[in-house]
Amino acid sequence: MSDSGFKVHSMELGPMENFVYLIEDIASHRCAVVDPAWEVGQIVARANQHNLDITDILLTHSHNDHINGIEDLLNHAHAEVHLLKPEYEFWAHELDKPSLHHGGDELTLGETTIKILHTPGHTPGSACYQLGNEIITGDTLFVFGCGRCDMSGGNPEHMFETLKDMKQRLPQDMLIHPGHNYSVKETCTLADQLEGNPFMHYEDAETFVNYRMHVHDRTRNEPYDAISKQQLKIANLL
């Protein structure tokens, strides 16, 4: 939630611990749903509870667990679907006139400005949505983790560059809203990530790729807790 002209409402839905987000523009009561999936009835009920008009759907990427409620939601709301052009091309799915974007584009939701970041790695056209001092990161960045890169469209080298860019460009007090509830807490700041996300500790692509592709999933279990740089060094993983 924010003290600005918007609020971010989170809902954990489905068997894969997905977070679905409702971005509320306070002045206009317009609402954008990020990654509608699983229980569309609950999403609509939450919007109605806050007297919100769902006018937009934002996709962080095209994996089924993040998009399987689009058609159902469009039956309930006259909404415009937004995603990055490279993700639409990777997805190869027919949508009725979606709005295709590029990294750096901005959306306007009432009086709220939403900046779209192109963050490839989990998929070629993965996107994060930045509004004020908060960012919705999909499966790019989790609390103390990052998205897999071994699925179709995944690329660990691209993920390394994406996280490196986020470390350099985003303010440390920015609040992270991830795509799944995989960790010991639902959200955190970028400063928390820099301190405790093992993927943020790597300075070169080769060691990052080795950890992401061959080590991480064998050595960590959910819920993810913080791992310091020193802990990685002691374990000879850095």
Please annotate each region the language model reported.
Residues 2-3, 161-175, 179-238:
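Accessory terminal helices/loops
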Residues 2-52, 128-138:
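Conserved beta-strand hairpin/beta-sheet module of binuclear metal-dependent hydrolase folds
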Residues 17, 28-31, 38-115, 195-203:
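Active-site HxH/HxHxD metal-binding segment of metal-dependent hydrolases
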Residues 22, 106-131:
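Core dinuclear metal-dependent hydrolase active-site scaffold
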Residues 33-34, 55-63, 82-85, 118-121, ...:
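Active-site neighborhood of phospho(di)ester-bond hydrolases with catalytic His/Asp-centered motifs
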Residues 64, 68, 125, 142-143, ...:
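Short active-site segment of divalent metal-dependent hydrolases/proteases
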Residues 89-93, 144-151:
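A short acidic, helix-capping loop that chelates divalent metal ions and anchors anionic groups
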Residues 131, 136-142, 146-147, 156, ...:
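Internal catalytic or translocation cores that form aromatic/hydrophobic pockets or channels
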